[in-house]
């Protein structure tokens, strides 16, 4: 059996006709298997959705209770028969609940990675290498120039700046799902026990992470805090908020941005970032190539990102490779713009909730 007889790229995403499903479809379909909760992979409007419990919960937080006709949760490692194929979900190390999807049929095994990283993250299960015949990999940072710095060193750089400028506020642009919580957890791991402030747009998902047992220490909402109270503290906010009037209410703010794209100095300058933090939730070039080799796959399909460069590398290693050229996937580190939605869905309020005045 050929891999193309099991999975095939279509305008709506990777389709498994034998199983009657799509993986991370880019438009509404009858049955969708979703790798993780970022909006370019997890869309509302499908007839049925199969995903990890965390991904389903995150979709519900973002889209409301009726984001799909029906939903089904699957545990890591659990096998499920769908039509003529067997599927299972395995940790991808990208964000909480993120998964690779393994599809097996008549002796052929295909693994769709979704977005992934191969470095430790205290807020989600680590990436699991799965042996397969065909590996479908992302390529967000699929160029040799992208070699991410050690994330711990970037956190140390942030803390040195806070110590050097105690009279200033530090605003860290980070995306609401995954990056924000990872940065906070790494700050705690580095011994930073001071209150971390949150923009209101970060609250729902950060609360959800805490409800799943992830300890993020003392957090307060920015609204209700006096300007003087924010000096010497770190505030986590959507990247777009750093250019808003909102940011002018902080005392002489230092603008930081946690993203793999901060490896490109021009992007940092364009965003007015004075403290770029190269912290990514995607594998860098070395992570992509080492992961491909570790899977033992003889064939690699490359999607969303720098497809051609990674295909070329695979061919140079004697592997069969092709780009999938599916339109509709982006990169949350570059294009996700979080609205300032301060509506609440989970109990156990953060310190500072409901206080009047101050910054929101």
Language-model region placement:
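Short, polar loop motifs at secondary-structure junctions
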Residues: 9, 25, 34-40, 54-58, ...
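Binuclear metal-ion centers of metallo-dependent hydrolases, dominated by the metallo-beta-lactamase
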Residues: 128-129, 143-227, 299-344
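Short coil/turn segments at beta-strand junctions that form active-site/ligand-binding loops
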Residues: 47, 108, 166-169, 192-194, ...
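C-terminal regulatory/interaction regions
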Residues: 2, 213, 221-346, 360
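Glycine-biased, low-complexity coil/linker segments
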Residues: 352-354
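Conserved beta-strand scaffold positions in the cores of enzyme catalytic domains, especially
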Residues: 22, 32, 49, 71-73, ...
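Short, well-ordered alpha-helical microsegments
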Residues: 42, 98, 120-121, 180-184, ...
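His/Asp/Glu-rich metal-coordinating catalytic cores
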Residues: 2-27, 31, 37-178, 189
